Structures are given as structure tokens and as C-alpha cells.
């Protein structure tokens, strides 16, 4: 058992360092004799500590426990009231405290003033502009840093330098906090008025960001960047991140390409040793100089100097420093503005009359034609999804807010809730459910707003529309997305691709006679000028489509969709401003509709096509690719002559002028070698990702527990690390200790051990080895996994009461009735469970479940209950396989060039040996014939878990299942009687196993699992024809080989001699694997 338990023990001695503090380790074992010794050891420890005796004697007396059993948790208690943070902080508060410049930011409340100056009274106070929104406190963060510093004060050589750098930065933070005192948080980890009133308003969020930055310092360069950002972000809460990251959009255009990877016909990355020169007009350098000047004006010194130094030779070798600056700039924290300012931002654009109507017309027509193209097949064939659009909408109704709180009655229980799903049920029960009437959003019923905060950009507003809008749009949008899935232009939706494919697409056509145009159109998407042409284009498309069919239900679906667009053309929003709610006419497009992503992509594609058609009047070129990815679009243009500086400048100016004619305030750039968009950037033929995920500040509060947030923290750390921003792992582990500890009483706390937090059970939080997902197969690991499974799902009285009410039952049976043609328990139960799960977003229910979960956990962490579960997990399968493998040393040459320079060494090494993959492995069963058959006749979408259950039933049960979903008997018979059915069994099992093994997450998503180089390290003699068994053996072997290589930087070869007699046993077992949801898997999913 590794590092974690060691650090945990050290951390506890650091935190509770008084005489009265005691640490009692609790052990367990799957061996019953040893287990009874564990229990004995534990009770004697308790006995001794009650009587104030030392535990040392017991440790030697029970050395068998300590050596052979597994640490389960550590019970720690201390009677000290800890103002320990303040005491320890003084030691580090040796510098001059920072003084905020109170005139720096345009908006008064974005200046870091003393809270009582911004909010004179408690009534006016809000923490919404500085709330770290994370379930850990500033005092914990300070403790974690001071623990690290104390632990490393005797480091030597290179490590000593890191210690000194961090110490120096921490003294800035410590001194500043010490001047005002450490703000104490309340039980919900919020900072109230009386704590903050005499302190700078942004103190907490600034300190969290600063701690996150200083604990990510390793080199001298890191130190310089961090120091500058820490000092300046204390005053500049508005524009710092934007200033620092702006130059990147130009820097990518300055690096020559000397060898790169391109996408070939098979959609794989293949190396190309082409050389493309960066052709940069003087105008571009002037713009860059302007950006650097702006940085210096804002007080930055070292960062602009680093960029300036790099500009001397613009080498790709030293480009990672530029990437580092770009990533770091996001870690200054979120910019959180008042809602009023966020909304007015989009209304500030003045209307000008001199716009090019011709261009607007073309733009509208392109939107219209694209909408028609996306939907015409479905409409002409009267697709059942468009016919049953209302049912489809209800089945996927979200449990987000519906914009207003209502009093709802569920049986005898009356509750207040804002949730969409609950409102729908209530409306149905009371005859108020009218999906055929789309409520207006005009001055009579303005739209309530949500918010989206992101570092380095302004706060954006989100519409919280009534659920009728969701139902009206759902089915049509799903059809649009299906079309986008097989259209390369839509980079975000393109079938199972990942970002590496988009990278190869760009570099594919770069050459000395082509240039790439890239534009950030986020300003345009939310501008008022976009509204009319955008909505009208969609409406015109819907009108054309309505004439292609005679089916009344399809026409109704299209009409309701059209009505949502008409209503939104005249939209008003409500914004709380102090105690008043302001109504503002809001003509712009905002997120919040189901169509947001799809429609924006359509519009952005139409926009770049409009611009290209304009400039093609002046230049002769071939458009090699056009892509749209979220708020960005880009195109590669190939000319018939070599590109010159003058050409680049002319095209650039013409493009900008063209956008200006539409009054689009966008950032359009032209380069010959690279692009920079929100999701990724390409420089020198290599791909980079921004490592900008904040760790100690969150965007908003949800209903996740501390455990969930600890898992998200770890997951964010991993993503940042893969992208080139590394935070000290010991610090992350310390945060996990703090966030997963459970308080029993005021002075008693229980800290789970590494085994508890890393075994894949319902409680998993992190991996004991970064990038390696391990599935424990030892007796103790399987034992604890079993124990946790026994208390996995917790009941909630409120949820049970609601789901027993007639309101809920009638709703569920109504859905089932509409969906099913005959009785189908699997589906009915599935719907009921899904609906019940949606109730979790109602706070009282999630709180109730959390309490139950914690009390069960407390019991378990003090003594695991033996639980004979018949459930089989993936661990059991791997445990059966493991003994039949023998390993030997092997050698693989590094044969691929680097193309993702920011990857950690050990991950890079694997890609260079076995290659990378540009596709997501299908892990949801959607490619199986049964899934396609169902979607051909029904709006119901079974999950991979359900397909896995169904496909292993008897043939006649599968037939009944299909027929109940409306599949014609003849089709159901054909399916079961054909070869396809047995192929499906294999295919779904494969998907399910990939899903369980998280093959599309973490760094596994980068590796080519079908690499011939990897295959040749694995030898499995072919015995008997059970493809499923062969598959699991191969996959297990590949993961073993890769995990070994990540850990050791060398390769092994595996030989497997699996007995034929065992195969059929294993095959049977494979149809009973239970999937485990944990904070860890949720965090992975959340990364998506």
C-alpha cells in the first residue's frame, strides 16, 4: 500500500499536533483469523486511548496485523479547538501584504475593495461574485500548503529550489491573508457577511487561485509566471486572463511546420515530413506588439518579456513555454459579473443601418437550406421520431430548473420545487399540461436567467425556458444532430471522432500555396444582429419542410418548433438588480434552448460560407476544408500560386472587412501554419490543448457531495496534467484526504485509507497511480469491494413518498402506455427508475440520501461487514483470468514522432511506441443491430446496461421485448433467427466491457488499442470458438502491457494458456457483470 497512507498519517500528525491528539489505525482482512486479530487490535487501541495510555506497545504486539492486514481507515481525535491555521500562518507571513488598486477595473464591484465598501449592509451582500463554490475551505487549503512546506523544508538540490520558490510565493499569500485574518467558512463552505465585511471582497477566491498556482510551480519560469499572476490578480479581477492569453491567437501563426501528422484516407494520423513556412505580414506583428504593450500597461513584466524573447526565433522547441503561459492565465479564477452587466453586454452593440442586406440574405438562405437538408429525409419519410416528438421529449426531460418555484402536491406530501420534471408531472395531474401551446416570453412573461462563468471571458447569461420549449425542440434537434454526426464540417458532432482527427484535417492541406482562416465568432452568436436572420432562416426552413409531408403529427411538430422561434424573436428577460426585478427587452440569442449547440453550428457554418463566397469574387482559390466547432470556425483555402506576405495581409483585411459589413464583431485571423480556437490550437504542426481547469474554485454549486468533488478535483488534475499543467500530486492527495474525511463528532474524525478510495467500488475517488486504472484482484481488494456493494444504493423517504403518489405513478404509466404496444417490464421499470433518479436533483432528496450514505460508510469504515454477494464485477472476471498469464521482458522501439508536446513523459512514450487513435471506441451499443432496429420503430433509447441485459435473455423474450416497443413481428422474428443476433451478443458485450473499463477516458483515449505493435506482444493460442472470451483475454492483456509501460517505461510480453474447460465458465460469468457507478466514474463522465 503506497504513498497515500503514509502522507495521511503525516498529515494527521501535522494537523493534530497537540498532546491530546490520538491516531488509531483500523485494519481489516479477508482472512478470518487475521480479521479477528484486527478487531481485537482495534478495541485494545480504543481502550488504551480512553485511559490515556500509549499505543506503541500494541503496535509491536499486533505486528502481524500491521504487516499482513490492509489499512481500512484512520480514526483521529483531538480535543483542541483548532485556530491552528492562524497560528501556523504567522510563521509564513513575512512579506509585505498586497494592496489592491481600487480603480483598475471598469465595473466598481470588480475592484477588490473591502466588502463593506461594496455592500454597506448585510441585506445588500451577496457572495455570488466571489463564491469559490467548492466543498472545501480556504483554511483547509492553507493547511494543505503549510503541510507540504513543512514536510519539504529539508529538501536538497533541485527539490530545494522548488521549495524556495513555493515558500516565497506562499509568503505573499500568507502575509496578505494574515493582515485581515483567515475568513472562516460556515457549514456549507460559504463566506458570510460578518466574516467578510472587514476583508477584501475577493480575498477567498484570490487566495484559492493563488494556492492552486503556487502548488503548480516547479521551474523558475513557472515561478515567474505564477508570481506575476498572483500579484496582479489581487487587483485585476476582470481582464487579466484575457490580456495574458490574447497573444496566442497570433503566436500560432509564427511557427514554421517542419514535419507534422496528417489525416489519411483511413482517418488515421500518419507522419508527413512536409515543410511549410510561416508567412507573417508586418501588420500581424504590429497587432502582436499592441497586445504586448497592453500587457505591460496592465503591469505585467516577465510574461511579455518571455514572449518577446521567444519571438527572436519562434522555435517550436521553445513553444511549450508559450503554451504554459496560455494555460496558466486561466488559473487566476473565474470572472463573475453581476447578471445585469452580463445581459447588457450583449445589448450594447448599436444597430447600424449600413449593413450589407445582400449578405444577410445569403446568410439566412444558407441557414434555411441547411435546416432543410438536415431534416428532409426524416420529414419525407414521416419519421416516427417526428411523429412522437412529444413522447420523445418527455422521456428525455431534464430535471433542471423550469424558471419558477411552484407548490406541488404528491399524494399527502406538499413540496416547493422549480424542477422541470416535477412541473410536468404536476401539470399532467391537474390538467394544465398543454404541450401544444408554447408560452410567450414577451413583456408579460419575461425569461428568468441562469449564468455561465468562465475564466478570461465575460459572464454569459442562459435562458431558463419553460419545459414546453424543450418538448417542442427535442425531436427535431435530435434529427439535426444525427445529420451532423456524418457531416465532417461539424467537428464537434462528427461520428466518434476525437480532437486528433480535427487536428490531422487541418494539417492535411497546409502547404506553401494555402492559408487557413480562423475566426472566433462567440461575439456574433450572442449579438442582436444575428437574431432576425438566424431565427428567420430556421423558420423559412421549417416552412419548406412542412410542405414536404401530409402527416398531421409531423406538421404539428414542425409548427411547434416554428412557434418557439417566433416567440423568441420577441424576448424579454428578468434580471434581479438588488431587490427589484428588472424586465429588459432582449433581442439576442442566448444558450438555454435545446437547439443552442446545433443551431449555432449551423449558423456559424452559414456565416463562414457567406464570407468565403464574398472573398471568392476577388481571389481564386479552392476551399479544401470548412469546419465549425462550437464558437469557432475555420477554413483552409488553396490558391494557385505560392502565398506571399502581401496576399496574407490582403485576404486578412478583406475577410475582416467582409465580417464588418455584417456588423459582426469577431476576431478573424489568417495564417499559413496554425490555428487557435477555444478547444485546441495547432502550432508548428503540433497540437496543444489549454490546461485551464480550475481546481480550487468552481463555476457553480451543484448538489454533489464532498466525495464527488474530491473525485472531480482529481479528474481535473489529471486532465490538466495530460495537457501540460501539473499541480503537485502530494497537494492533490492532501486535498482528497481533507475532502473525504467524515466527521463523527466535533472532535472525532474518520479518514478512509487508500484502499477504500482507489478500489473500484461505489466509493472510488482516485487512482493510486496516475493514468492507470487498476482493478484489484487480491482477496482483500475483492473483499472490500463486496462490502461496499452491500451498501451501495441508499433509500430516501421523500423520494419513496413521491414515487408512491398517484401523480408520479400516473405519469410513469402514461409514458409507458404511449410508448409500449404490449407489456414490457424491463422498459416500464426502466422508465420508473429513470424518473425516480431525476428526483435526485431535488435538494432534500439528495441530502437525505447523502446522510444515509455517510452513516453506512461510517459503520463500514470501522468494521467491514462480510457480504456474500452473488453480483459479479469486472474485478472477478479479471481475477479469474490473471493466473493464466505469464509475462516476459520485451522491447518496442520508439517509432512515431511526437505531435502532442505537452503530454507527460510516460504517456508520450507509449504513443511513440504504439501510435495514437483518432476515434472513440463505441461503448454505448448504438452500433448494434438491435439498437438500430429499436430506433427505427420507437423513440425509446435503451442504455448499454439494458441492451446487455436484454441480449442475454431467451430468444422468445427478446422477441417480446422488441414487439412491445412497436417493432413488427416479422422484423423481430427475422432478427432473432438471423446471424446478426449472435453477432450482436458479441458486439454489445464488447461495448459493455469497454464502457466498464473506461477506455474512452483519461489517457487510454489516446492509445491505439488495435496497434499491431501492441498485438505482437501478446500470444494467446486459439482454443475453441468463443469470441467473447478471446476478446476479454486480449483486452486484459493489452491493458496489462500498457499499464506496465506507463509505470516502468519498458515493455513486457504476455503469454496466456487459458484452459478450454474454463472458457465456458468464464463466458457464462461474463453475462452477469454488474456495473459500478462511483464519484470517480461520474467525474470522468463529467469531463465529457
UniProtKB/Swiss-Prot annotation:
Cofactor: Mg(2+)
Locations listed in the record: Virion
Lineage: superkingdom: Viruses
The entry's keywords: Magnesium, Nucleotide-binding, Nucleotidyltransferase, RNA-binding, RNA-directed RNA polymerase, Transferase, Viral RNA replication, Virion
Xref: Pfam families: RdRP_4, Rotavirus_VP1
Single Gene Ontology BP annotation: viral genome replication
Entry annotated with the keyword DNA repair: no
Functional summary from the UniProt entry: RNA-directed RNA polymerase that is involved in both transcription and genome replication. Together with VP3 capping enzyme, forms an enzyme complex positioned near the channels situated at each of the five-fold vertices of the core. Following infection, the outermost layer of the virus is lost, leaving a double-layered particle (DLP) made up of the core and VP6 shell. VP1 then catalyzes the transcription of fully conservative plus-strand genomic RNAs that are extruded through the DLP's channels into the cytoplasm where they function as mRNAs for translation of viral proteins.
Name used for this protein in its record: RNA-directed RNA polymerase
Gene source species: Rotavirus A (strain RVA/Human/United States/DS-1/1976/G2P1B[4])
